[in-house]
């Protein structure tokens, strides 16, 4: 089986040459026809090397593009005005990147909201997930969090497509493959524990809504200490078999609602960039066995 790189830098099968039948007696026309068929075939094969080369004599496969997708979850803003401990509409600089309903953290307070406008969170439930409802000053950070009820299975959500070719993010949780194959799924999560006790979480996979056997991993996240929340970034990889159009999701649960997945905005002392709560990549490895 022979393949050729198309103008889109993807490998497509090249059909074997359709050689003309040889006549009983030699004819110049047959030789010309045979030469033309073979010349066309080998010219197409030469195109493989021509598009894979990055320099004179170099062949490293850099011209090939396989199926892949890289996705993350990141949303943060700041308060646009101070708030007391009871208001249910919170004004911020922007709600871009936040879901229409979800959870946010302002300092140590977790808030559940049911709606958004371009600059407000509405229908807020203050002091959620065991936190205290308190007043906050203008300009403090507001970050998106993922915080399930204790011992409840939920998927990990993502809101950003960083890179994609034939692998897409559907409904904020489903890493969907357009082409069948064996894929490498790599993920990491930034976990936050605001409780004074260490808590556990578990992470596993579902393919098309069905739990994948032997995919669960268990992690313990350290407790808060010295007034600072416990933090832990964890991750590992899986090989998954997907048919065309199938999707894989990352699911998790925690033993305590004070253990959350959290984004963070840029920080100082020293200056550091923002932090995504979830990062996941799905990369084609091979055709199905």
Language-model regions, residue ranges each:
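Autoprocessing Asn-cyclization modules and mimics
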Residues: 57-146
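N-terminal low-complexity, intrinsically disordered "leader/linker" segments enriched in small/polar
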Residues: 2-65, 69-70
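Beta-strand signatures of extracellular beta-sandwich domains
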Residues: 112, 202-206, 249
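Short beta-strand-plus-loop segments that form exposed binding edges in beta-rich domains
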Residues: 251-257
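Short, surface-exposed tryptophan/glycine-enriched loops
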Residues: 226-251
